[in-house]
A protein has these predicted regions:
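Targeting/processing segments of secretory and organellar proteins
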Residues: 1-2
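Short loop/turn elements at secondary-structure junctions
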Residues: 5, 10, 15-16, 21, ...
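N-terminal, Lys/Arg- and Ser/Thr-rich interaction peptides
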Residues: 20-40
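Residue-level detector of well-ordered alpha-helical segments, enriched
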Residues: 29, 49, 53, 93-94, ...
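Structural recognition of short helix-loop-helix hairpins that underlie histone-fold modules
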Residues: 33-45, 62-69
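Amphipathic alpha-helical segments that form the core helices of the histone-fold
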Residues: 44-64, 77-87
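An N-terminal amphipathic alpha-helical segment
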Residues: 67-77
Length: 143
């Protein structure tokens, strides 16, 4: 009985985590990037700069095969992550890549060691995203 209950609990917990991931994917792209940069949603002095950098990163993501084939851009806080990507499996990686690239463009670290660490991480994320996009393309061709 306890095993069944534990099994059900894990299943319930899994469903809850899927629900929570879906909720996060419905967050505003601009707002979530700003939060991860340490800016409040209300503080809009740098919104134009951040939006410009976000759109640059969307161009890079499109070029490596992630997101809509015809590109994507934002103009305000209205677009949410699911407007760009529906695959919850790579959502966190896309979001991490976005934030790190925007941070490097908007507010690069003063320390050369930290800067190099960020660049290395960006390169790894980019490689992983490109590889995942290529694998998905191959899988779609085989279907």
């Amino acid at each position: 009985m306890a095993i069944v209950w534990l099994s059900s609990f894990r299943l319930l917990d899994l469903k809850r985590s899927d629900y929570m991931a879906a909720e996060r994917m419905n967050d505003s792209i601009l707002t979530s990037v700003k939060k991860m940069l340490g800016l409040s949603e209300e503080y809009d002095a740098f919104d134009l700069d951040i939006i410009t950098h976000i759109n640059s990163v969307f161009t890079i993501l499109t070029q490596i095969g992630v997101g809509p084939g015809n590109g994507f851009m934002i103009e305000d806080k209205t677009p949410v992550w699911t407007d760009f990507i529906q695959d919850s499996g790579i959502y966190q990686l896309v979001k991490s890549y976005m934030v790190l690239k925007v941070r490097l463009l908007f507010d690069p670290p003063m320390s050369s060691a930290v800067l190099e660490c960020y660049k290395t991480q960006v390169n790894e994320y980019e490689w992983r995203l490109k590889t995942m996009a290529e694998n998905q393309e191959v899988n779609n061709q085989n279907e």
